[in-house]
Amino acid sequence: MAKENLECSFCGRKKPETNLLIAGLDAHICDRCIEQAHGIVAEESRQSKKDDLNAELILKKPKEIKAFLDTFVIGQERTKKVLSVAVYNHYKRLLQPHSKEDDVEIQKSNIVMVGQTGTGKTLMAKTISRMLNVPLAIVDATVLTEAGYVGEDVESILTRLLQAADYSLEKAEKGIVFIDELDKIARKSDNPSITRDVSGEGVQQGLLKLLEGTVVNVPPKGGRKHPDQKFIEVNTENILFVAGGAFDGIERIITKRLNMQAIGYSASMREETLDETNVLQYIIPKDLKEFGLIPEIIGRLPVLTHMNPLDKKTLRAILTEPKNAIIKQYEKLFAMDDITFKITEQALDYIVDKAVEYKLGARGLRSLCEAVFTDAMFELPSSEEKEFKVTKPYAEDKLSYETIKKLKAVS
């Protein structure tokens, strides 16, 4: 066939009418048809990815979510229930097809958890992420500063979420962000100051747009922003934000409020109704405002819950009962070297007693166990011994006063 008579096998255009005509074995295709085909493939691919994401995101009912949390988190029954409902409502909202006729807009159920260090706030977020198969970014609020100052700006949060999602934008936009130590960005004072609070109220203002839902330009691969750079547009509307913090001293704010409310009531009535051993259970949004969070942030974290302090019984259960309990992990580690690991009840109680005495929390249990077992994990793999039994005297010998003091300093 003469070159002048060549034509596109799809649209029939002659070669002179095209910018480019590509030949195959028995057919030809022009540049316009290639462009059109590319658009069709891209749209099909986008829809396929969306369907895949919805298929991957297995949404369970609130009771099923709580049951999953129960296998990893000991205690905190009320918080697990509140979290299960909030997470269920959030992802139920995402999976619901949008209709233009539907004028009821369901807002996000962002969450704030208040509780002492080591009570399980981060573990809750990690467990939810694992169950739903969605990416999770854990961010320390203490390193955040206002844009333009030394430190990480709030948009770096989304960079971390993209990294957790392997730079899949679709996955990232359905992910979870856990902001740890939210209390550390509380407003330092109600009084105006000449010195700018770049790591406090300024960061809170920066977080607002992320929490409420907006499109943010994020530098790819965590790079610095510069004018010629291509950005990734991330829509935060469907990202679930979970914030946590110890809020040291908020108990005094709660107690003061409760004492003011108790005026006019008899002391006996107040004693019957208030549990002074766990004041956090009475927390309300007003207390967060008094602590130093701005009202706008509080309004965008509508689900408020608390973590109960860990008593001796709960800490004991954390050591042995969860699916990934600390003692079970050490059993598995020793088993990899064909060593049978055993620990007496008295030794377990001693480790728990030290965690309570020095207020190390659940996180401190791991550090205490590591201090007790390290020498054995160093020596036994090179020896002929096939059993390692930890008794109370052995634990006492390994947990000297100096060792515990060091652990307390870093906890």
Question: What do these predicted regions represent?
Answer:
Residues A2-C33, H38-A137, A141-V150, E155-S411:
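AAA+ P-loop NTPase nucleotide-binding core of proteostasis motors
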